[in-house]
Amino acid sequence: LVNFWKEKTVLNKTINQANEKKLEIRKMIQQNKHSTSISSIVEKMIPKLLLVIAIISVVTTAGILITLLSETVAFFREVSFVEFFTGTVLKPLGQNAQFGVLPLLTGTLLSSAIAMLVAIPIGLMTAVYLSEYASDKVRRVLKPILEILAGIPTIVYGFFALTFVTPILRSIIPGLEPTNILSPGIVMGIMIIPMVASLSEDALGAVPNAMREGALALGATKLEVTWKVVVPAAISGIIASFVLGISRAIGETMIVTIASGSSKNFTFDLTQSMQTMTAYIVEVTGGDAPAGSTLYYSLYAVAMTLFVFTLVMNLIAQYVSRKFREEY
């Protein structure tokens, strides 16, 4: 009988322990269900949140485009489309105002061309060196320098062009005006070097090492591997970096506003003062153009032209990147 009660006591303890385990398991299941429900809610909410953010971006772009279009249409009610895009005289003030955009287009394209003549060779050579030749120690030094160049405010570049580069160029080039298109073009090129170098280096770094090793195994030199294997394989990304650099140069504002002057000359003489589209926008917005006037609407017409230019450049970059992309 005593043994029976002992066994019964042990059995009861075992049953109690089992019941406690069941309760713990139930609590864990309930907690898991609760956490699972929270995670499922989060999983459902995140895509919706991302969709809202994407819609905000699209709506913002659409709002900018609608604003530009509406005011540009109002401008072309007063100034003919042909006069605007073929006129070589821009005199927005006075009774006989003329609104030819060619002086601004010339200044913009010349400054951008000068900038890319500086940025493309230096940026590409820098990218090739960092990707193919530089040691880790050298890369750790050059990378921060490029990042510093990319982070300098453009107004600082503008004063650098006006107070440092222009005096040097005037001592070399006779007849160079105090404000000209050459000096800001050169400084814009210096500003764009980090963009071209960084994007081109990324494109070169994406080329598999197997292609380099295969060329070296066939007896090619390091120089031949770089320029006949690696660079052609990365050409889509390199060209895209050039096009994006041009787009950046076209949209630059402060450098040309400070260093190129405000003369609306239709000329191809790099020694003369010229005005770009962005500088004209700054001039008009900083002036006393009354709302509803032709001068006021010309601001939006020029801005719309600038928008189309940069959009075309970005589309070209995307097309080139897709057209010549290599699959590895």
Predicted features, each with a name:
Residues 201-205, 209, 216, 286, ...:
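C-terminal transmembrane helix and the adjacent membrane-cytosol boundary/short C-terminal tail
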